[in-house]
């Protein structure tokens, strides 16, 4: 199978205006990925599916990632005058990187028996309803998984045929897979009508009679 560098070059040469970045994965798996620019993501996805050398016709998994705002420290060596002498010292600066959300897709070719190729898209920020293009029109297996990411992370997939919650109820607020999500104090109080159900149950079932001391059954040899 082609390397990611080769795939990147062919995508940018074939899809007008497309920009692809290779994202390195430093974990033991070293499963590097391709970051697609959102404007051309659907066109790139169609190319990956129909290109004869790739034929990535199956999307096995789609997941969301929440990246919080973070501060990165950078160290650089500079020359400065210290006590009248020029010396090389290390200066540390801080760079604030705003948070964002990602959707990551794992692609395989069932026809050519090869893969995976991992692609990802990135929102501009972590705002409620941050948009990304839906890839469900290219891989139908992404439909429910994009709905799950919408439900749990809050990414709005433009072009999705049926974008609505899939695990949480419609009235649920917030997105429980976000890293800054705060769990409510009581899961049973709302929206489960616990008190109403308990009252109906007491009306339906007659209470069990209490046994006095003479009616208790005791074990015998």
Can you annotate each of these PLM segments?
Residues 1-221:
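Terminal low-complexity/charged segments
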